[in-house]
Amino acid sequence: MFQNNPLLAQLKQQIEANKEYVEGTVKASDKAFGFLECDKKSYFIPPMEMKKVMHGDKVKAVVKREDDKEQVEIDSLLEPMLDRFIAQVRFNKDNKLQLIVDHPSIKNIIPANTHKKVTETLESGDWVVAQLKTHPLRDDRFLFAQVTQFICKADDNFAPWWVTLARHEQPREPVANEKSYELHDELDREDLTSLYFTTIDSPSTQDMDDALYIEPIKQGEVQTGWRLVVAIADPTAYIPENSNLEKAARQRCFTNYLPGFNIPMLPRELSDDLCSLVPNEKRPALVGYIETDLAGNITGDTRFVSAWVESKAKLAYDNVSDYLEQVENAWQPESAETKQQIDWLHQFTLARIEWRRNNALLFKESGDYSFELNEDGSVRDIHVEYRRIANQMIEESMIIANICCAKFLADNAKTGVFNTHAGFDPKNLESAQKFLLDTLSTDENRDALTAFYAPEKLATLEGYCEMRRSIDEFPEKFLELRLRRYLTFAEFKSEVAPHLGLGISHYATWTSPIRKYGDMVNHRLIKQVLLGKQAKTVEEGILVRLQEARRQNRLVERDIADWLYARYLFPMVEQAVEFDCEIADVSRGGVRAKVIANGAQIFVPFSTLHDKKEEMEFRPEEIALYIKGEKAYQIGQAVKVKLTEVRLETRSIVGNII
């Protein structure tokens, strides 16, 4: 009798029209309930509704109100949190396969089966890749997954590496070596083997991209400048443009440098041998001749040639730095020619540093952290290394070489893989100006600084550089760290554009073609120009892949480091070790502090900082926490932190500020 009843249909429409729908992301709690995080509000999800979803699911829900209390009833799934995911194996009491998702906030235990292509016998604790097959909201069935790939056994000490690489779908192995490699030369090679090229690198480095030769330019007996000859390994001479090797390099894009070892972009026979500029071996190279005056200004156009070169010496950063810094009992150059090259390159470097200080931007000095590992993958120690003068010598040589490459490609090829950085995100320009004025201005100088930090000026290369130089002497770190949050990301582009982070109008890397696919592309473009050919515009797909691969590699490096830090600090919890730290972030949940000595990040929950929540205020615009109206903690602030907990299963490190 109710079938096709228009009154009933109208009633249903009215009920539906009166429902208040919201969309958001599920946030699980330590209890059975959860929250739906929407754009401007958070709604309570009762335990029965949480059984339909998991942390991270994007859902549509209906708001229910009763006695001034709000909660939601889940309506439908918009996007599941899980698709492909990493998990550890477990078996229930009936020996049925289940998966523990490797995510700190997902507590769901997911029943699973195994795809037929997985041939390993799974045991409790093993690491696997799985695919979510069913979801209660989407398939009207309970959560269920399928194991699609075995990663490693539970007791594999190298699990941090293998699991992380699998998570980000990165290869474990280098590209397989070819049976043989042939040199494909279209350009005649000049014989430059008589020039006294040297390399400066880490003692363990095998894939040496660059070698340098430098000499003074003289008019009569008076020196007027420097001639720097930059020899760069030439892998494109061995790799035909549409070969399988080229395709593999294009997919990987970068050599992946991980704690303990690297995964090269090219086969090791090329990266570590045939292309590497090892000492006393004749190698093909692409060579750039760069000339400057004594103040470091580039004079004239850079000349590129295809050549044969022979490095005469492989030098180590620390040895060269010790020699130049006159450390007691320091290493000494083994020949007069090596000594001359080091001394000349040192003088050239000092001129270029001063040139960049006045005309571009210098890097802020910060240490690089490196893990010293035992053979079984355990962490023996963590070292902080700072750039010394020898590192700066190579750095300055590579920077000027890349500036010259960018100008050459822009002028001649009209395309390239250009490294660009627009500085502040356009939507943050006014916020950046306001922050600078609030921090630096006084009643006397506010009008002048308002013009100096005008948004339209901050958006230009000149204005951005002037701003950065103006804050160089500011003693508080928070100014620099806060401004970083307003920046946009660096991008690869096929047309030349400024790199505001470097303070340079043109920048394109070509100095690491063994390690970076974009540099290989630029090598091919330089060669096309030298051959008199019309250069092909760099495909957008290449730029997109470079951007994605760079992001993936950074995530891989970060995730492995997080795991190794947790392992390293875990034994120290009982000792309640205290660390000197710097606040790296302040968020709604707490403070994240970086340990100065080793780079580990320790989370300090807000609940440990003050016992009255209502007296605490997080101010995101300052990245600061206020207690009772007074600023208590801010990004960049020095603090002392006591280690209190390390959770190995989630790789989280927790402490208290003391």
UniProtKB/Swiss-Prot annotation:
Enzyme Commission number, as recorded: 3.1.13.1
One GO CC annotation: cytosol
Pfam families (alphabetical): OB_RNB, RNB, S1
EC top class named in words: hydrolase
Boundaries of every S1 motif domain copy: 576-658
Keyword set includes Nuclease: yes
One BP annotation, GO: mRNA catabolic process
GO molecular function, one term: RNA binding
Keywords assigned: Cytoplasm, Exonuclease, Hydrolase, Nuclease, RNA-binding
Record has RNA-binding as a keyword: yes
Catalytic activity entry: Exonucleolytic cleavage in the 3'- to 5'-direction to yield nucleoside 5'-phosphates
Top-level taxon of the source organism: Bacteria
Broad class of the protein's primary localization: cytoplasm
Cellular localisation: Cytoplasm
Annotated ranges, domain RNB: 189-530
NCBIfam families registered for this protein in UniProt: 3_prime_RNase, PRK05054.1, RNase_B
Family of the protein in this entry: Belongs to the RNR ribonuclease family. RNase II subfamily.
Function comment: Involved in mRNA degradation. Hydrolyzes single-stranded polyribonucleotides processively in the 3' to 5' direction.
Protein name: Exoribonuclease 2
Lineage: Bacteria, Pseudomonadati, Pseudomonadota, Gammaproteobacteria, Pasteurellales
Protein's gene: rnb
